[in-house]
């Protein structure tokens, strides 16, 4: 683990966190993360039979070539209008950031049944795009928090025979957590050059060994998402290097998962079985 700005430490990634008025009190509450170049991407989301509007919309996108994500609070059990709002958020954010329509995932967690305040969010998305920066990873990590007591993330350097790889991470989650993911969002960025199929396979294994093994209060969420973005700025990974990258991704997901358990709402003890 090294010092860095989380998801924006790998070259080619920018992020921001702004106050759009979702939380009140001037708190950062809208996060935007983008890659400046085409990426391989992998996405694992909730197994809930009632996924949120953000998950429903993001599933319609080409999951292997996403360029980033926009993150806010609350948009589950909101019916067809919720999906319309999620689509508008994704498309408006992409346009504001100068990215192709359909290239940004949309993620939400928060109060179930409340529609997004789209007027405030539209202004917030413009502000988030204007604030995008290679130093914005920590603001992004702060903006995605809801009931979290502290931001969760880190920066990691992986020394491989084929060259060094940098990995950044940001996550949120503190309640409604059970095996098969949780009320959680997690984002991992890397400059590694990985084929989309290889990245998806590694991401699924990492989720199974980390986020799918934690529980705080035994409740499943409709919004859980793990998104991994690899922009290819670094060395290509294959063979042993690819296997070592997969091991590192798994270790990072376990690290983030343990932070979620330690930050469980009302938790006084963390137990490993």
Language-model regions: role of each:
Residues 69, 74-81, 102-123, 215-237, ...:
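Short, surface-exposed loop/turn segments at secondary-structure boundaries that line and modulate
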Residues 32-88, 96, 105-107, 179-199:
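Glycine-rich phosphate/pyrophosphate-binding loop regions near the starts of catalytic domains
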Residues 30-36, 59-61, 70, 156-160, ...:
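Short beta-strand elements
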Residues 1-46, 50:
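N-terminal amphipathic/basic leader segments beginning at the initiator methionine
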Residues 99-103, 134-141, 155, 211-223, ...:
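Flexible, glycine/charged-enriched surface loops at secondary-structure junctions
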Residues 227, 231-273:
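A glycine- and small/hydrophobic-rich beta-loop-beta segment
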């Amino acid at each position: 683990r090294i010092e860095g700005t989380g998801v924006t430490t790998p070259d080619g990634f920018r992020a921001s966190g702004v106050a759009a008025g979702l939380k009140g009190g001037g708190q950062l509450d809208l996060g935007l993360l983008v890659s400046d170049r085409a990426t391989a991407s992998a996405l694992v989301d909730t197994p809930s039979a009632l996924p949120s509007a953000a998950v429903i919309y993001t599933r319609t996108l080409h999951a292997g070539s996403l360029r980033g994500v926009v993150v806010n609070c609350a948009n589950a059990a909101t019916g067809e209008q919720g999906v319309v709002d999620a689509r508008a958020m994704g498309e408006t954010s992409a346009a504001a950031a100068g990215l192709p329509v359909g290239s940004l995932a949309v993620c939400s967690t928060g109060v179930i049944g409340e529609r997004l305040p789209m007027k405030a969010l539209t202004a917030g998305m413009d502000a988030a795009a204007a604030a995008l920066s290679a130093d914005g990873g920590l603001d992004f990590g702060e903006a995605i928090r809801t009931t979290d007591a502290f931001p969760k993330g880190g920066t990691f350097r992986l020394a491989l025979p084929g060259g060094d790889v940098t990995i950044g991470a940001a996550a949120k989650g503190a309640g409604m957590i059970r095996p098969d993911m949780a009320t959680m969002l997690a984002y991992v960025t890397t400059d590694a050059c990985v084929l989309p199929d290889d990245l998806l396979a590694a991401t699924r294994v990492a989720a199974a060994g980390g986020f799918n093994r934690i529980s705080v209060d035994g409740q499943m969420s409709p919004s859980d998402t793990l998104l991994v973005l690899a922009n290819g700025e670094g060395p290509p990974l294959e063979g042993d290097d690819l296997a070592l990258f997969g091991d590192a991704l798994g270790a990072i997901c376990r690290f983030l998962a343990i932070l979620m358990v330690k930050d469980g709402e009302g938790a006084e003890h963390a137990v490993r079985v």
